[in-house]
Amino acid sequence: MEPAAEILVDSPDVIFGPEAIEARYEYRTTRVSREGGVLRVRPTATRFTFRTARQVPRLGVMLVGWGGNNGSTLTAAVLANRLRLTWPTRTGRKEANYYGSLTQAGTVNLGLDGDGREVFVPFSALLPMVAPNDLVFDGWDISSLNLAEAMRRAQVLDCGLQEQLWPHMESLRPRPSVYIPEFIAANQTARADNLIPGTRAQQLEQIRKDIRDFRSSAGLDKVIVLWTANTERFCEVVPGRNDTAENLLRTIQLGLEVSPSTLFAVASILEGCAFLNGSPQNTLVPGALELASQRHVFVGGDDFKSGQTKVKSVLVDFLIGSGLKTMSIVSYNHLGNNDGQNLSAPLQFRSKEVTKSSVVDDMVQSNRVLYAPGEEPDHCVVIKYVPYVGDSKRALDEYTSELMLGGTNTLVLHNTCEDSLLAAPIMLDLVLLTELCQRVSFCTDSDPEPQGFHPVLSVLSFLFKAPLVPPGSPVVNALFRQRSCIENIFRACVGLPPQNHMLLEHKMERPFPGIKPEEVKATSPLPCKKESTPATNGCTGDANGHTQAPTPELSTA
């Protein structure tokens, strides 16, 4: 990957200092009030000062479920990129990359050059960010297989790549993890041979000790903990048990019901480490959220948004945004990896069903022209376990929408999702964006005391199926709104205005100041980039499958 050009914002409101980037930024929005039958809209402006520390830390990542498909694939991806590996496949040689990562393969628009052309740079060039090749990995798993054996068991990567990675992954072995059988499917028992013994309080203390040991032995500045283990059943929120931080900590000490993922979340928060939940269960119960708020530690979740649901968050936004009334969404999946096997149990499937079904809620609620209060599309989600297909998940979707004058439109999609190869770059983005957010602080003219983002890090919503947000905040699932949120907040950190896509410079009758006008040319269809090539059946490439007929001669009589 080519290094990005250095970005320097030429503005009196921005200072690129040796320790931090400081930017004065005017946040413009609107406030709406209802007065009788009138909606009164009032534009507002708030002056912010953003400060982003430039020193990039040595960052460690601890994966819960390190030996699973996602954990072994992410570790392999970072090693393959660090070692610049290439390997043969039946379609030619491949080389390591970070495709699928917003931060490493996405771009942002800086603005227009003197000729009116848009200038794009890598997302990672906007602000100082940890290089993924510098990440240090550790983690836990209920299975004792080393990472090389776990990679082979996952059957995700080509054999040629596995062979090159084997000596680098063979020495990586997960630490023992927490296993509470009633929270995951019974079919996972065969893998559970690497367990932390003792009471819940003793298990919590061991997790904390593991985090401290990793930070110390690897010489790390920061550690982020990411849950990528099995989907658990939902944990009931019970007053007096897990509704407050105090009650949750007492519940752990008394050995009452608490899920393994919540144990890891609490341990991470107590150690000052951000915790991210990549599975659909309600790991971050109210007590865990309150603890994170008390300790000023970031938490995020829930459930990686990687394949079918990501498409759904785009397609339903398109349909409703186009004025079509989507009435039925039916989503069917089958997969054969361990995630699919675990989800074959009803309670674990229910956790997944909830996150996959809620992804269209905000889009429906945004359009009261189409949907009356309380009205929503029929939405059905089915997941089946088919061992033969392995990590190559099949997703089939049917969207039925009402058109004008009683018409209907049906879209049917088939999506083959390489489950772990889609999830791994999302895990990478979660870690890198969370760490970057830890270095951002801001204040306003009316509140000059510096503060950070809310502990519930909703800026990560782009990467989660069921994004957690601070109490009272709107939940946004529409994918491009989520991406714009990340991009525009980071633009604000360097004093750039939000990306509004207006391009008024190109919509004016007279030339825009500072943009060189071009000669007006007649509009015509774009030329075909490929020339017609004769086929073996005598047809040419642009003849729509038919033999090219000779041009008829017109009579002049």
From Swiss-Prot:
InterPro entries: Myo-inos-1-P_Synthase, Myo-inos-1-P_Synthase_GAPDH, NAD(P)-bd_dom_sf. NAD(+) binds at residues 67-70, 141, 177-178, 188, 191, 228-231, 278-279, 303, 306, 337-339, 352, 390-391, 419-420. Its cofactor is NAD(+). Inhibited by 2-deoxyglucitol 6-phosphate (dgtolP) and 2-deoxy-D-glucose 6-phosphate. Inhibited by copper, mercury, cadmium, zinc and copper ions. Activated by potassium and ammonium ions. Pathway: Polyol metabolism; myo-inositol biosynthesis; myo-inositol from D-glucose 6-phosphate: step 1/2. Residues 514-557 are annotated as: Disordered. The keyword Lipid metabolism applies. GO terms for cellular component: cytoplasm. The keyword RNA-binding does not apply. It catalyses: D-glucose 6-phosphate = 1D-myo-inositol 3-phosphate. It is found in: Cytoplasm. GO terms for molecular function: inositol-3-phosphate synthase activity. It is an enzyme of class 5 (isomerase). Optimum pH is 7.7. Phosphorylation at Ser-524 does not appear to affect enzyme activity, and is detected in brain and testis. Its main location: cytoplasm. It comes from the Eukaryota. Key enzyme in myo-inositol biosynthesis pathway that catalyzes the conversion of glucose 6-phosphate to 1-myo-inositol 1-phosphate in a NAD-dependent manner. Rate-limiting enzyme in the synthesis of all inositol-containing compounds. Belongs to the myo-inositol 1-phosphate synthase family. This is Inositol-3-phosphate synthase 1. It comes from Rattus norvegicus. The gene is Isyna1.
